[in-house]
Amino acid sequence: MNSIKVKIAYVRKDKAPKLPQYATPGAAGVDLQASLDQELTIEPGQIVKIPTGLAIELPHAGVGAFVFARSGLASKYGLALANGVGVIDSDYRGEILVAVINQGSEPFVVKDGDRIAQMVFLPVFIGEFYLADQLDETGRGCGGFGSTGVS
């Protein structure tokens, strides 16, 4: 497994810092925990930004951090990321906030230290754009949504 050095700053000066941890040796995502002063109740349909208390510095622009929902929270309670996937750019230095939506039918309570999302580090390619008169032909062409599943 490849690794990178990620510098972390703990933005909560009133609490002891907690470094993110991988749940298992083969885990791709590191768990992010809620950093709360009190319990937070998320009502059905409500979107909230949950603080983690962490800010990171990625080693270079060729790496991005991506925040994903935790599968258990999504499948058991309907707790999903409000923006689908969170993207943390290499030049962002603010606190990592996790925007979640309760898509379930019951209120969901988040406590300090609860694992609320997972963060994965991935290579990032910067596009160099240029204008073309036309694009190369392919077998798929302009077929969009569901076009490859139709016979």
From Swiss-Prot:
Question: CDD domains, from UniProt?
Answer: trimeric_dUTPase
The protein's required cofactors: Mg(2+)
Q: Which UniProt keywords apply?
A: Hydrolase, Magnesium, Metal-binding, Nucleotide metabolism
- Write out the residues that bind substrate: 70-72, 83, 87-89
EC code(s) of this entry: 3.6.1.23
Gene3D superfamilies, A to Z: 2.70.40.10
User: What family is this?
Assistant: Belongs to the dUTPase family.
Explain the purpose of this protein.
This enzyme is involved in nucleotide metabolism: it produces dUMP, the immediate precursor of thymidine nucleotides and it decreases the intracellular concentration of dUTP so that uracil cannot be incorporated into DNA.
Name of the featured protein: Deoxyuridine 5'-triphosphate nucleotidohydrolase
Organism source for this protein? Answer: Desulfitobacterium hafniense (strain Y51)
UniProt lists the gene as: dut
